[in-house]
Amino acid sequence: MIRNLLIFLLSFLFLIFDLPAYPNDFSAKVIENYTLKISRKFSNTYCNSTKFGISNDGSLSFSITETNKEFSNNKLNKYIDYELLNKNILLNLENNCMIFNFPEYELENLAFN
């Protein structure tokens, strides 16, 4: 009887205090996909705003602001490789928008917390 009561009590305690384990690290594939998503968003915003007739400086500040706003609260931000992000943005701008003279140093303003 005592044994059954002890088994029931321990089983109950294990079920109550069982906490799921979540990984702190994210896979490289997830981080790479997130970086590509950011670069596509920035590139599309910049392309659309320049095609709409906004100046290059205005398009740049608008694109940086919109991208920062959209991605500022993501947990993956601390894992972003900014060099890879900048290269992806430049490649997207060259391939999709035919913009070859984009000032790379301006991408330093694209930073997430």
Regions found by a protein language model. Name each.
Residues 4, 11-14, 28, 51, ...:
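Low-complexity, intrinsically disordered short peptide segments enriched in small/polar/basic residues
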Residues 24-75, 95:
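Short N-proximal segments of mature Sec-exported proteins
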Residues 57-113:
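Compact alpha-helical subdomains of small soluble proteins
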Residues 8, 31-32, 78, 82:
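Sparse, context-dependent recognition of short Cys/His-centered cofactor- or disulfide-binding micro-motifs
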Residues 4-7, 16, 36, 86-88, ...:
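Alpha-helical interaction segments
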Residues 1-23:
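Classical Sec-dependent N-terminal signal peptides that target proteins to the secretory pathway
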